[in-house]
UniProtKB/Swiss-Prot annotation:
The keyword Transmembrane applies. One of its GO terms (cellular component) is membrane. It comes from Homo sapiens (Human). The keyword Metal-binding does not apply. It is a multi-pass membrane protein. PANTHER family: SERINE INCORPORATOR (PTHR10383), SERINE INCORPORATOR 4 (PTHR10383:SF5). Incorporates a polar amino acid serine into membranes and facilitates the synthesis of two serine-derived lipids, phosphatidylserine and sphingolipids. The chain crosses the membrane at residues 59-79, 122-142, 153-173, 184-204, 222-242, 259-279, 286-306, 338-357, 427-447, 470-490. This is Serine incorporator 4. Keywords: Lipid biosynthesis, Lipid metabolism, Membrane, Phospholipid biosynthesis, Phospholipid metabolism, Transmembrane, Transmembrane helix.
Length: 518
């Protein structure tokens, strides 16, 4: 074949692209990488010469993350009152042109192109886009399958399809969109919160098991466990002090004080149970590292909840004061704290991206029941990876491959990356479907979506958002307590002592020694 000498190995992403396209290298080297946009070749083939280690699945994951970030940024711009005023010159409610609206719907009441309605429509398009791909990629186990091209290729067509879905959503009138899609978004948002809680507890549990395995063998790993534990407890303690300083006041904020005190008690409870003798009897690897990670996450959820509640107004010395939020303890009107809103939004979106990538990886490693299996995994040797090591996937690939006879002169099996996916494509898109719904309801204040604005979402807050985040914090505590206490309810395992006694009873007696020693 032409170009066979310079052709790449089958294990690279460029080799996969040539396999999909029939082995021709001319197709991959076409100008402007048009095959990456419209054809079956993955985008990794365009930049393989500069980044040889970039695989098709990794490149696709980065592209999907960029698509989700772009869609979320568009939602924030359409929800921002400041952007609407400066770009369109109107205070609110930018509607579709009446002529186009009458031609499409035959109605004078046109859909709104800004505000919560626009956020619902954009997120409806992105959620539908990922849900369709999740359904089409179910039970996909090989990147060489034709269905894998749907995930790794045809980017221009997929972008046009996504824009078409969003355009169709903007053509749906409000009375048909909001009632059904609002409840779908609430259910999807709660499901994504539960998924985040499972992932953070599994992350802490696996990290602790990983490094505790090394601590039992080497003192350097014990030092790493100690430093990481002190670091997370320090962050949790500093966070608690800052929350008491900025979110409480001697004259009010009783709810904030009670909530902070309760959550600090939760942190102390899970720390005590993590090293309790009854817990360590069933879970010898249990320690303070996982409790410190959960305590730090509890403090983050507490900060997120307190920053989402409306301010409290009290009368002190005949003057009206606004309390319980940073920078609102004085009588004078103040500008909103944009830095606090940006910090809260950045942490929230970082958790969203972590959940989307980690869930798809664990689903490929452990299978459909990864939520249960990830807690029972035992590390054979420690590694710097905080979650499950890469050897899990390699072992899985070795078990899945067919055994070859020793005398058969055939080339060795291809690398694991060619045989198996690095993450589950279907789970990846399904988690992004839930993430789109979660971003939608978070930006629009969950239950009170009417009149939602970006400036109010992360600054003024609402009671609905406050109680949702408080409930998610309590659910995290209950999930971790269940993880610690569940092994206590399991029946005790049989010990091998009866087998040893049975061997002693059936000992053979030689003729020279009629009475064996007892």
């Amino acid at each position: 074949m032409v170009g066979a000498k310079a052709g790449p190995s089958p294990g690279t992403s460029l080799g996969l692209a040539q396999q999909h396209s029939g082995g021709s290298s001319v197709l991959v080297k076409s100008p402007f990488c048009q095959v990456c946009c419209c054809g079956p070749a993955p985008c990794a083939s365009c930049c393989h010469s500069r980044w040889p280690s970039l695989t098709a699945s990794t490149c696709s994951r980065l592209f999907y993350i960029l698509l989700h970030v772009g869609a979320s940024a568009i939602c924030c711009l359409l929800l921002s009152r400041t952007v609407v005023e400066r770009v369109w010159g109107k205070t609110h409610r930018i509607q579709m042109p009446s002529g186009l609206c009458a031609h499409l719907f035959g109605l004078s009441d046109c859909p709104v192109l800004s505000g919560s309605g626009a956020v619902y429509r954009v997120c409806a398009g992105t959620a539908t886009f990922h849900l369709l791909q999740a359904v089409l990629l179910v039970h996909l186990h090989s990147p060489t399958s034709p269905r894998a091209q749907l995930h790794n290729s045809f980017w221009l067509l997929k972008l046009l399809f996504l824009l078409g879905l969003c355009a169709i959503a903007f053509c749906i009138p409000d009375e048909h969109l909001f009632p059904a899609w609002h409840y779908i978004g609430i259910c999807g948002g709660f499901a994504f919160i539960l998924l985040q809680l499972v992932l953070i507890t599994a992350f802490a549990h696996s990290w602790n098991k990983n490094w505790q395995t090394g601590a039992a063998q080497d003192c350097s790993w014990f030092l790493a466990v100690l430093l990481a534990t002190l670091g997370f407890y320090s962050m949790a303690g500093v966070g608690a002090v800052l929350l008491f300083h900025y979110y409480t006041h001697p004259a009010g904020c009783l709810l904030n004080k009670m909530l902070l005190s309760l959550h600090l008690c939760f942190c102390g409870l899970i720390s005590f149970l993590s090293i309790a003798p009854c817990i360590r009897l069933k879970q010898p690897r249990s320690g303070l590292l996982q409790a410190s990670v959960i305590s730090c996450y509890i403090m983050y959820l507490t900060f997120s909840a307190l920053s989402s509640r409306p301010p409290e107004r009290v009368i002190l010395q005949g003057q009206n004061h606004t309390l319980c939020l940073p920078g609102l303890s004085k009588m004078e009107p103040q500008t909103p704290d944009i830095s606090l809103a940006m910090l809260s939004a950045s942490i929230m979106y970082a958790c969203v991206l972590f959940a989307c990538n980690e869930a798809s990886y664990l689903a490929e490693v452990f299978g459909p029941l990864w939520i249960v299996k990830v807690y029972s995994y035992e590390f054979q040797k420690p590694s710097l990876c905080f979650c499950c090591p890469e050897t899990v996937e390699a072992d899985k690939g070795q078990r899945g491959g067919a055994a070859r006879p020793a005398d058969q002169e055939t080339p060795p099996a291809p690398p694991v990356q060619v045989q198996h996916l690095s993450y589950n494509y279907s789970a990846f898109h399904f988690v992004f479907f839930l993430a789109s719904l979660y971003v939608m309801v978070t930006l629009t204040n969950w239950f009170s979506y009417e009149g939602a604005e970006l400036e109010k979402t992360f600054i003024k807050g609402s009671w609905a958002t406050f109680w949702v985040k408080v409930a998610s914090c309590w659910a995290c505590v209950l999930l971790y307590l269940g993880l610690l206490l569940a092994p206590l309810c399991w029946p005790p395992t049989q010990k091998p002592q009866p087998l040893i006694l049975r061997r002693r009873r059936h000992r053979i007696i030689s003729p020279d020694n009629k009475y064996p020693p007892v």
